[in-house]
């Protein structure tokens, strides 16, 4: 059984026991997170497709960690003009583990 959820402006295919990093959600480590924006649920040949969301479906997850991704370097340069600009960015994330999918 798997589901497609939407969180943080992105879509993820999840199933029980899966660990994934999503955009930061302000919750405590070890607490339960309920995601109710479920776009699709599939159980074998039985597929429930939402328009846009599957009504009554939800995904439960446990928060494992709050952290920051590796630094992404942004570098701009104009050739022959001695213009160079460097910037870095680290995005916050929440690591979760899927504990249950309910329809």
From Swiss-Prot:
Name the Gene Ontology molecular function terms of this record. rRNA binding; structural constituent of ribosome
A Gene Ontology term for the protein's cellular component: cytoplasm
What Pfam families is this protein classified in? Answer: Ribosomal_L21p
Q: Which InterPro entries match?
A: bL21-like, bL21-like_sf, Ribosomal_bL21, Ribosomal_bL21_CS
Q: What does this protein do?
A: This protein binds to 23S rRNA in the presence of protein L20.
Summarize the subunit comment.
Part of the 50S ribosomal subunit. Contacts protein L20.
Q: What is this protein called?
A: Large ribosomal subunit protein bL21
Q: Which gene encodes it?
A: rplU
